[in-house]
Amino acid sequence: MGDPKRQRKRYETPSHPWIKERLDRERVLVQKYALKNKKELWKHETQLKNFRRRARRLLAARGKQAEIERAQLLQRLARLGILPEGAHLDDVLSLTIDDILERRLQTLVFKKGLARTIKQARQLIVHGHIEVNGQIIRSPSYLVLKEEEDGITYGRASPFANSQHPERMVIEEVQKGEAQ
């Protein structure tokens, strides 16, 4: 069986809890992307910090191993759809938290028009109505790979898979109204 790994926090909290500018910025992001709480935002901010930290370290590094790690970092960000193919390490340093949050499953379900609101997108995901390439994903914070983006659909067993479902008809009417 072995010893299980120790569970660690996957995020860093802000160093000072009451900075008004940061609180205002976080509140806007939580509302825009319908995050459950600030912890979800801090997890993605920590991810972004780690990408940027690695890029700064690799910009200063020389050698064969540094070249390999540069290519791996850029390839990872390109697979996630955060950066375009052929990007440079300087592009990693200019990433913002919005670039990460735009790749969440919750955001992409809303943008594809599978839900009326971003909050409804979260509910559909948590309730198991959304699948990615045939696999039901119940985590709204799942970062969708670029190649998986076209595979986001309603689940086969979901009532939403039926095109005559009343809620789907409402969603389609809303989309038609926005298109006009």
Swiss-Prot record:
Signal peptide: none annotated. It holds the Pfam family S4. SUPFAM superfamilies: Alpha-L RNA-binding motif. InterPro entries: Ribosomal_uS4, Ribosomal_uS4_arc, Ribosomal_uS4_CS, Ribosomal_uS4_euk/arc, Ribosomal_uS4_N, S4_RNA-bd, S4_RNA-bd_sf. One of its GO terms (biological process) is translation. It comes from the Archaea. Part of the 30S ribosomal subunit. Contacts protein S5. The interaction surface between S4 and S5 is involved in control of translational fidelity. Belongs to the universal ribosomal protein uS4 family. This is Small ribosomal subunit protein uS4. It comes from Thermococcus sibiricus (strain DSM 12597 / MM 739).
